[in-house]
């Protein structure tokens, strides 16, 4: 199963924010430069993550972004459910004439659920715990 770039970069942004010292704000520009992604794309991602409560935005001269809740309370499966469209196949009868008898949609739904069930066992904090290699890459050690 492949996640959209939107979700991929959203998870990366959360991991980056979790690597910051508690209470430290950063800018969207810093996040975009860290992952070499378009600023416009990252603004949309940060806005969505903010709407979902995963990121807190602070306006003003000394503003920035940070996690909206502790990293050990941000469940990866929950993040993905919030921002990933999950249109695995188009099963509308006007697009596929075998829809009434097809069992593929059910099998794919079960696979998606197993995928999310596994990701529900992991938090953003889990991605950083005892992971000095990642912290070095994020320049946090």
From Swiss-Prot:
Gene3D superfamilies found in the cross-reference section: Winged helix-like DNA-binding domain superfamily/Winged helix DNA-binding domain (1.10.10.10)
GO cellular component, one term: cytosol
InterPro entries: Tscrpt_reg_Rrf2 (IPR000944), Tscrpt_rep_HTH_NsrR (IPR023761), WH-like_DNA-bd_sf (IPR036388), WH_DNA-bd_sf (IPR036390)
Pfam families from the UniProt entry: Rrf2
HTH rrf2-type domain mapped to chain residues: 2-129
Coiled-coil parts of chain: none
Presence of keyword ATP-binding: no
Keywords of the record: 2Fe-2S, DNA-binding, Iron, Iron-sulfur, Metal-binding, Repressor, Transcription, Transcription regulation
A molecular function (GO) term: double-stranded DNA binding
Residue numbers binding [2Fe-2S] cluster: 91, 96, 102
Cofactor(s) required for function per UniProt: [2Fe-2S] cluster
Co-factor binding details: Binds 1 [2Fe-2S] cluster per subunit.
Biological role stated in the UniProt entry: Nitric oxide-sensitive repressor of genes involved in protecting the cell against nitrosative stress. May require iron for activity.
The protein, known as: HTH-type transcriptional repressor NsrR
Organism: Aliivibrio salmonicida (strain LFI1238) (Vibrio salmonicida (strain LFI1238))
Organism lineage: Bacteria, Pseudomonadati, Pseudomonadota, Gammaproteobacteria, Vibrionales
